[in-house]
A protein has these predicted regions:
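Single conserved hydrophobic/aromatic residue that forms the stacking wall/gate
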Residues: 171-173
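Flexible, acidic/Gly-rich N-terminal and inter-domain linker regions that tether
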Residues: 1-65
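Generic serine detector
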Residues: 11, 22-23, 38-40, 49-50, ...
Length: 173
């Protein structure tokens, strides 16, 4: 499966997470026209920063594959839906390429549970580590903690979700 197929599946699956504020309404997007965009293109959504700015995020799942069968969840294991999983490297590269092109200012990341909560969180941590360390990404990251993950891994995930600018500002205090 190519990266575009994965992006299509995993951004569509992420739309069920009600944490971003885009209405999903069409905003004049017309195929082939320059300058017209849609809030639903390529998994982009909008949210507001603490200072009131509207921020565009890449909203995706690491994976929509899940070992659980929660009846309320579209990604439950018995649901007949196309499945996809990014590697940490694919997710980091996709995010940084969207960022470099000014499509997004940050990442909203969640996931189905692959094997176990800890295993899934370790993959998320790897993706965020690549973004922060290798690509020096200083944008906004919202990473959803997977229920049942060990506290140590949740702490690592949270640390990587805080921007380095924010950390540096508090180091001088």
């Amino acid at each position: 499966m190519n990266l575009l197929d994965k992006l299509t599946i995993l951004s569509d699956a992420a739309k069920y997470d009600a944490a971003c504020t885009s209405s999903g309404a069409k905003r004049g997007y017309q195929e082939g026209k320059i300058g017209c965009t849609s809030t639903s293109v390529a998994g982009c959504c909008h949210t507001f920063s603490s200072d009131g700015r509207c921020v565009t995020l890449l909203k995706v799942l690491l994976s929509n594959d899940c070992c659980y069968n929660c009846k309320y969840c579209v990604n439950r294991c018995t649901n007949d839906t196309p499945r996809a999983t990014f590697t940490p490297e694919e997710l980091a590269e996709l995010t940084i390429e969207f960022y470099r092109r000014n499509y997004i200012e940050g990442l909203f990341l969640s996931s189905g549970v692959l094997r176990s909560p800890d295993y899934t969180t370790e993959l998320m941590i790897r993706a965020l580590s690549i973004l922060r360390s290798e690509y020096r990404f200083n944008g906004y990251i919202h990473a959803k903690a997977i229920p049942g993950t060990s506290p140590e891994l949740v702490e690592q995930l949270g640390f990587l979700s805080v921007s380095y600018t924010h950390l540096r500002a508090h180091e001088t205090v």
